[in-house]
Amino acid sequence: MNAAGGGSGAQAAGVAAGNISLSHNALLSTASGATTMPMAQLADGWLELESDPGLFTLLLKDFGCHDVQVEEVYDLQKPIESPYGFIFLFRWIEERRARRKIVETTAEIFVKDEEAISSIFFAQQVVPNSCATHALLSVLLNCNENNLQLGDTLSRLKTHTKGMSPENKGLAIGNTPELACAHNSHAMPQARRRLERTGAGVSSCRFTGEAFHFVSFVPINGQLFELDGLKPYPMNHGGWEDSEDWTDKFRRVMAERLGIATGEQDIRFNLMAVVPDRRIAITHKLKMLRTNQAIVSGTLQKLLKADEQGESGNGDSQRPDTPTTLLEPSAFTARDLQSLLKNLDTEIAINEQHLTDENDRRHMFKVDASRRTHNYDKFICTFLSMLAHQGVLGELVSQHLLPSKKVSGQGAANRISKQSNTASAGGSTTGASASTPKTQQQQAAAAKNGKSPSKTPGRRRKGRNKCRKRK
C-alpha cells in the first residue's frame, strides 16, 4: 500500500509533523546533511536497515530517546534486568503450508475489539522498509512515560496518533520527517542503490519471498502483547502468574514459536532487548558507593583519632558518632572498617571499569556506523583509475587470476589420476587375463625351452643373498 496521496495519509502526515508547514517539493535532511529526500517521496524513500543492536541504540538517540539502549540476547534462560520489550527478527523463506499453520496458531489470539486496539499503540506497516522503526516504536510508545523519557518527537507522535486506526498510525510514522531522516541516516549505500534499482514499491520486509521481519513483544496492562505490523490485529498471549515476571511468559511463548517454526521451515533469527541505558544504573551505583566510602573513611579516621587520644591518657575522649545510621561505632572495630573500606574500593573500581566499557561500546557504535554508512565507491574507483594510469592494473588482475587457473588445472589432473588408478585397480582383480602381451610371450618361450620363468631382479638378488649365507 502506498502512503502517498489520500485524505487519511495527508491528515496523518500533517498531524505527525506537528502542523509544520512544509513545501511539497521540500528537501528533508538530517543535521549532518547525509540524508536528503523530496517531501513528495517521503513515505516511498525509506531504506532497508541491518539488524544490529548498536545501530538500533543510535537510532533511538536520533529519535530523541536518550535513556534507552538495545542489547542482543544470546540465551533466553539468562535473566535480563528491567527490559521494556523484546524485538524478534527472523529471516524467513515463505512457504504456504508453513505460513498457514502459523497463521492458524496466532489467529485465535487476535484482539479485534476497536476500543482495546485504540488504547494501545499498534500501527500497521504501510510504508516499505520501515519495519525496524515500527518495531522500536511499538516498544517505546507502549511504555509508561513515568519510567521512560520519550523526547519531543516521540511524545508528539504518541499524543497526536491517540485514537487513530492502525493504518493511519502507520501512515503517521511513514510521514514523520524526523523519523524518516533518522532511519535513513543509518542505512548502507547499497540499500539506496537497491531502492533506486527496484523501485519504492518493493519492500524487503513485506513483499519478497525471502524476508527479514521484526516483531515486538511488550507487556501491556498485565498481558503479553505481540505487535506485528504485517498482521491486521495485535495478538494477546495472556497474562502470567503472580509469582512470575512477564519475561517468564515471554520465554515460554518464544520457545513454542521457535518449535513451530523450525519444524516447518528454515528460519534464522536473532533476539534483541530494549533496556534502560546501563550507564545510568552504573553511575547511580557509583554515586552511592562513593557516598558510603566517604562515610566509612570519615568514621575510621575519627575512630583512629579517638584511640590515639585514649592511648595518650586523655580520659575525656569519647568514641566518635557517625553522621548517618549506616554504621554504629560500637559495632565496628578499626580493622572491620578498614576491611569494609577495602571492599568499597574494589566495588568502585569494578563499576568504574564497567562504566568505561559501556562508554567504549557507545564509541564503537559510532565508529561502526561511520564505516557502515560511508560510501566507498569514489575511493575504489579512484584507486583503480590510478592503478590503470600507472599500468599495473592489468598485471595485478592477471596475478590474481593465475592461482585460480592453477587450482582448476590441478583439479583436472587429480580427476584424471583418480580415473587411471581406478582402472588399474579394477584390472588387477581379473587374474591372468590382466597380463600384458609381452609377459605372456616370455612365459610361453620359457615353457617351450623347458625352463622356468625368469625371476625378477629383486627375487634374483634375494636368492644370491641366501646362497652367500649358506656358504
UniProtKB/Swiss-Prot annotation:
Superkingdom of source: Eukaryota
Listed GO MF terms: chromatin binding; cysteine-type deubiquitinase activity
Transmembrane segments: none
Keywords tagged on the record: Chromatin regulator, Hydrolase, Nucleus, Protease, Thiol protease, Ubl conjugation pathway
Catalytic activity: Thiol-dependent hydrolysis of ester, thioester, amide, peptide and isopeptide bonds formed by the C-terminal Gly of ubiquitin (a 76-residue protein attached to proteins as an intracellular targeting signal)
Enzyme Commission number, as recorded: 3.4.19.12
The keyword Signal appears for this protein: no
Spans annotated as Positively charged C-terminal tail required for binding nucleosomes: 405-471
Annotated disulfide bonds: none
Protein name: Ubiquitin carboxyl-terminal hydrolase calypso
